[in-house]
Amino acid sequence: MGRIRGLEAPTTPIRLCPLCGEPSAFDEITEFYYCNHCDQFIQWLPDSYTMMMTGPPGAGKTPVLHHWMDFYARNGRPSVFLAFDDSPANLRGPLGGYTHEKLSEYEGHGLITLVDCYSSIAGVSGREKYALKNRADLNELSLLITDLLNAMTSLGSPKIMLDSATPLFTYKEPQLVVQFLSTMAAKVKSRGGAFLTSLASGTVSEENVRRLQTIMDFAVELRILEVEGRQKRQVRLAKARGQRVYEEWIPIYIGKEAISIDVGDDPAKYERLRKAFESPS
């Protein structure tokens, strides 16, 4: 029996990504059109930079870093993920989604390295090749980052990701943590790499947040809004050294395999964002 005219299920309009021209996917739960064909603004970042990413718990800081690790691995640039907020064993599942089940391959080639900076809090030994014995020891952390930086530089521009710096502020005086992050950021960038750190908003004083923003080339903020009973996530570029900041809050989709932003159908808006991410001075 044919379908009765007028009772057909509504179809979702096709929408093309303004960057790559491919059809966007549609998430019915979040009602978000997202692109899973191109890398969007991550491809505009320079190889060598420093960045701080802030936002409340659940805003998507860790998934964004996981997504970027996949981008860098696909392009032959090694990433080191210093896991302070959870054990690598718990991160491998979500990270496997963003790497499209190539995580083991990337780890085998040295393109992704997970460092256990979490297990020591429970007094147990981590199973990772690299792990901190005392996650409150900034000297140990500094030596470990330096060793990893030396090992990874031969593979390409290394990306050091510290997720997150929040626990460090609970163990040490804020000025010591700020000084440590400043030193590490400068060291990694001087070796042609990138240093990225996340921070839970509301856990550190605004003064120290501003000090960290001053240190970093880029400052990215994430937030969660409640809209008609649904959570909506947004992102904005709060600082870009040497460039005019793209000041608007941008809707962002955080999926299990893809992350995508939406600034509308006007390519000129994406061009403004691209210029904001141009190489910092």
Label the predicted regions.
Residues 44-108, 112-116:
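Walker A/P-loop NTP-binding active-site region of P-loop NTPases
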